[in-house]
């Protein structure tokens, strides 16, 4: 060291450390800072501070870095104001984080898009044409040491990471990205339908419902190998995509005599199925092969760039199909192309997800003398790890099993990153590498982490990238681009969680480390560890569907910001779903649909600029019928079918998730009209408790409510003692859970129960309109009859409840509206599991609120609470009363988890508030507790039942109960009660 350059220890380092520590962001947990050295060069007028890695593990921008440098100079307590300060975090000069700009990041340069849905999402300011590779952590895999299939993580807090991350990616994140115009590829099965049908000309175990017609050009065999389902079970080395033939035809221009290939799968049952196509990519393949999908939704067309993606399964979407058979085309391929001299190729089609068909066996290290056999997983394919999907999808075994079939665990995590390069190889993103020529913009590995606290502390969000200390990707992009992607996504996640759920949410480090899924992809890549699945405080939020929606939206926004900034263009975020939806009769044959846009307080660009109206007639499928610029639509009705509607908000960034479903039915001028009000908007985690040393989820009382469905629930929690540690994945400690539902899909809130109620109302001869509870509460019309759907609505808090509660059964505005209508003579049918408990046994309400709630229930609806959790068998029956309309009814409502209807664990029991006005009309079968009451209040009549009407499993039973209710209203409408006394005399009401 020269006299002009010296390094200080002890006190100076401590002062600098103290200064840097003071600038750590709030709720950050990147690890402890450490100052290794402080060197001052007076000749160069430079201060160099070398710190440990943690100093570079947080988000750094020009302002924060300037503040850090300023604090260093202040800590030196000398005249160094004109000195340059350089701060190192490990090997990284923090200035280098700012030297990489977005204009140095190279995006794809391909002329033609990969997959183009005709009449699809219009998102010029979204992710239109971008290709994203993404996967949801681990999956069910074969462990040769134990000669069994198992999860890669422990069963804990009613889920397992291998399934848990899917509950973000499949129902939320993938659709959001697709709604923004992106094409998303996954190395795991994305269809939860356990039926799977393969149609292929090569036969074998495939259906052979494949047909060709030749027009100007004739079909012939291509010179390359293709798919054949020659083995029902795949073993080591098997690749179905080199076992068969590919068909080929020269392309013609649109309007010429076309040649057509059709695939007509015989599906075992009606339902939603994913459709995958396959083909070969040849030197002269068409960039715009035209596929048509015929489904219950109509005909949808796609242009597929066959120059990319040959020799694997290419996803086109999910579609609703009838149970179909030979001769009814489902997928069609025409040989039209805009490119002269191009060829079209055709190979197998896959419909549905199915069960795993890759068998594994112990190859090395087994017990001597045992002749190990191949073993299948026997699990749905969507639960399996990526390694097995890749084999089924024709990926070379050099990618999916670098261990040569010895170690599936390491193969799986190594294969996922290598798969990205296999997709991108040969494209502008990864030239000079053999692959599928698909220009992948970025990749995301979505994981959750381990780690636990004994209190209410959040573990929080960790993100990992790899910069190779300033290295570059194959296309010249600086690897620091991954840090920019990581920062964008992590910032959005943490900011949105703090703004909506938990202001103390921890932002952990942005690690620059050589994790395979962050290091291997030759495109900007992020490995996300969202939260700790082992920490109860994290999972109070993590099991909540609305939290999952928010996080998924944050990730989508982070990707959008990164790609838009890379491309130097403005971006627009897709809107949130609309609110306050209502359908009202305008005049004969005309109905007004109205709604309101939902403001995204975190994103100013997310307001809708137009709306898409979709209609479903009867029990058909939704189809687009209108595009409107204002928040209303006039539906013209000339029949007595049930017409259901949903609204999709849209802007230049894409489209929102659909709204709740409302419906109408017009039975003619003489029919009375029922207004159905959807007050069941709840989606939530299971009930939980925290009693210090014991805590956990109590789904025996309430499993929570999934959004549409849940694919992450494995079974109830069994270990509630906080001090029980993890010892093995088979002995997970605190939070350990059962496994009896881990292959099942669990039904949730479909937001489509107006239709279920409406079917029974229409069967009784009544017309109906419908409304969301919000719109209804603010309306001023005077309906004759109200049918209020409350399902499993109840007041809850998410996590610590910092931002208040939601989903109360009867908010004040709704109470006021119903009270006003009652005075005006509106009759009311109310059904729900918490119609009384939420107003009496509610720890989130003050005494004053409870008093007001109970007064409303007694005076307006005519009941008082007896008990919650009133039935477990799910059976109820009518009892004799002075209201003779209710007789001979027996009802079975859903009390078990299943894939078609949400479960009712805790139905309510209550009794008439006034025996002179009300009567018991229904009891639960196993204990004779009251399950329903009817009241004739003089001004209005009410019927209230303690379980949701829509969960009655038999349609005829639903029809019977609805007709009995409507007959009761009709017979008492004039104020003359058809009331039977104990001696069968009839009294008039005054």
Segments predicted by a language model, with ranges:
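Non-catalytic propeptide/linker segments at domain boundaries
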Residues: 50-150, 341, 346-375, 379, ...
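A short beta-strand element within beta-rich, extracytoplasmic domains
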Residues: 259-283
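Short beta-strand-plus-loop segments that form exposed binding edges in beta-rich domains
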Residues: 331-343
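Beta-strand-rich modules
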Residues: 635-654
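Helical hinge/lid and interdomain linker segments adjacent to catalytic or ligand-binding clefts
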Residues: 716-848
């Amino acid at each position: 060291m020269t006299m002009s350059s010296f390094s200080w220890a002890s006190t100076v380092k401590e002062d600098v450390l103290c200064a840097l520590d003071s600038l750590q962001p709030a709720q950050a947990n990147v690890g402890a800072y450490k100052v290794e050295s402080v060197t001052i060069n007076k000749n160069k007028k430079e201060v160099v501070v070398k710190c440990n890695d943690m100093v570079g593990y947080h988000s750094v921008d020009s302002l924060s870095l300037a503040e850090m440098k300023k604090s260093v100079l202040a800590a030196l307590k000398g005249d160094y104001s004109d000195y340059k300060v350089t701060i190192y975090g490990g090997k990284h000069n923090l200035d280098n984080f700012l030297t990489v700009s977005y204009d140095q990041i190279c995006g794809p340069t391909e002329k033609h898009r990969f997959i183009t849905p005709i009449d699809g999402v219009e998102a010029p300011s979204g992710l239109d044409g971008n290709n994203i590779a993404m996967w949801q952590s681990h999956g069910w895999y074969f462990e040769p040491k134990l000669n069994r299939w198992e999860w890669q993580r422990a069963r804990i807090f009613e889920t397992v990471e291998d399934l848990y991350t899917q509950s973000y990616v499949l129902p939320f994140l993938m659709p959001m990205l697709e709604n923004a115009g992106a094409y998303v590829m996954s190395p795991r099965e994305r269809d939860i339908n356990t039926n799977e049908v393969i149609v292929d000309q090569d036969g074998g175990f495939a259906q052979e419902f494949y047909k060709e017609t030749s027009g100007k050009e004739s079909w012939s065999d291509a010179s390359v190998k293709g798919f054949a389902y020659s083995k029902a079970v795949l073993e080591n080395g098997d690749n179905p995509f080199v076992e068969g033939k590919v068909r080929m035809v020269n392309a013609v221009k649109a309007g010429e005599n076309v040649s057509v290939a059709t695939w007509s799968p015989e599906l075992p049952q009606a339902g939603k199925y994913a459709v995958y196509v396959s083909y070969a990519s040849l030197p002269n393949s068409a960039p715009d092969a035209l596929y048509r999908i015929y489904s219950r939704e109509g005909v949808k067309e796609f242009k597929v760039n066959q120059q990319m993606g040959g020799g694997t399964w290419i996803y086109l979407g999910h579609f609703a199909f009838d149970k179909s058979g030979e001769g009814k085309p489902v997928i069609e391929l025409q040989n039209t192309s805009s490119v002269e001299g191009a060829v079209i190729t055709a190979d197998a089609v896959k419909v549905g997800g199915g069960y795993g068909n890759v068998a594994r066996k112990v190859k090395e290290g087994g017990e001597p003398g045992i002749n190990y056999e191949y073993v299948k997983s026997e699990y749905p394919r969507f639960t399996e790890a990526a390694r097995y999907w890749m084999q089924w999808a024709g990926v070379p075994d050099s990618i999916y099993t670098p261990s040569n079939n010895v170690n599936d665990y390491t193969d799986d995590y190594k294969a996922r990153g290598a798969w990205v390069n296999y997709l991108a190889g040969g494209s502008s993103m990864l030239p000079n590498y053999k692959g599928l020529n698909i220009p992948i913009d970025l990749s995301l590995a979505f994981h959750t982490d381990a780690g636990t606290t004994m209190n209410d502390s959040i573990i929080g969000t960790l993100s990992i990238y790899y910069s190779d200390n300033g290295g570059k990707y194959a296309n010249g992009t600086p690897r620091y681009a991954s840090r920019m992607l990581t920062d964008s996504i992590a910032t959005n996640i943490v900011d949105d969680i703090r703004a909506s759920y938990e202001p103390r949410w921890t932002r952990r480090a942005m690690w620059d480390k050589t994790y395979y899924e962050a290091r291997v992809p030759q495109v900007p890549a992020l490995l996300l560890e969202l939260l700790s699945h082992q920490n109860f405080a994290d999972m109070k939020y993590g099991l909540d569907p609305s939290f999952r929606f928010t996080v998924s939206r944050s990730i989508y926004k982070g990707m959008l910001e990164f790609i838009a900034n890379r491309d130097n263009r403005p971006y627009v975020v897709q809107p949130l779903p609309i609110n306050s939806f209502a359908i009202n009769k305008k005049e004969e044959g005309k109905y007004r649909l109205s709604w309101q846009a939902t403001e995204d307080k975190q994103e100013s660009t997310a307001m809708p600029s137009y709306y898409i109206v979709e209609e479903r007639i009867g029990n058909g499928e939704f189809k687009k019928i209108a595009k409107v610029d204002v928040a209303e639509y006039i539906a013209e009705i000339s029949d007595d079918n049930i017409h259901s509607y949903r609204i999709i908000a849209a802007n230049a960034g894409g489209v929102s998730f659909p709204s709740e479903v409302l419906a109408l039915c017009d039975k003619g001028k003489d029919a009375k009209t029922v207004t159905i009000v959807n007050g069941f908007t709840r989606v939530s985690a299971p009930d939980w408790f925290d009693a210090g040393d014991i805590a956990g989820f109590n789904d025996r009382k309430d499993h929570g409510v999934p959004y549409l469905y849940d694919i992450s629930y494995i079974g109830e929690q069994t270990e509630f003692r906080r001090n029980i540690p993890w010892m093995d994945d088979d002995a997970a400690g605190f939070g350990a859970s059962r496994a009896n539902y881990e292959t099942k899909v669990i039904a949730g809130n479909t937001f489509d129960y107006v239709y279920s109620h409406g079917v029974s109302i229409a069967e009784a001869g009544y017309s109906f309109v419908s409304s969301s509870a919000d719109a209804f509460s603010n309306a001023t019309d005077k309906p004759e009859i109200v049918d209020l759907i409350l399902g499993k609505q109840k007041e809850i808090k998410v996590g610590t409840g910092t931002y208040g509660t939601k989903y109360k059964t009867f908010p004040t505005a709704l109470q006021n509206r119903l009270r006003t209508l009652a005075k005006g003579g509106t009759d009311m049918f109310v059904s729900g599991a918490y119609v009384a408990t939420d107003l009496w046994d509610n720890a989130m309400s003050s005494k004053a609120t409870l008093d007001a709630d109970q007064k409303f229930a007694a005076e307006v609806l005519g009941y008082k609470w007896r008990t919650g959790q009133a039935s477990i068998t799910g059976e109820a029956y009518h009892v004799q009363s002075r209201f003779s309309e209710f007789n001979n009814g027996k009802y079975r409502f859903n009390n078990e988890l299943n894939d078609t209807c949400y479960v009712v664990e805790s139905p309510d029991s209550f009794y008439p508030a006034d025996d002179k006005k009300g009567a018991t009309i229904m009891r639960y079968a196993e204990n004779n507790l009251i399950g329903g009451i009817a009241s004739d209040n003089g001004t209005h009549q009410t019927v209230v039942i303690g379980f949701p009407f829509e969960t009655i499993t038999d349609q005829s039973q639903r029809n019977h109960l609805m007709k009995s209710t409507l007959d009761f209203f009709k017979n008492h409408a004039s104020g003359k009660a058809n009331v039977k006394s104990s001696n069968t005399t009839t009294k008039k009401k005054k």
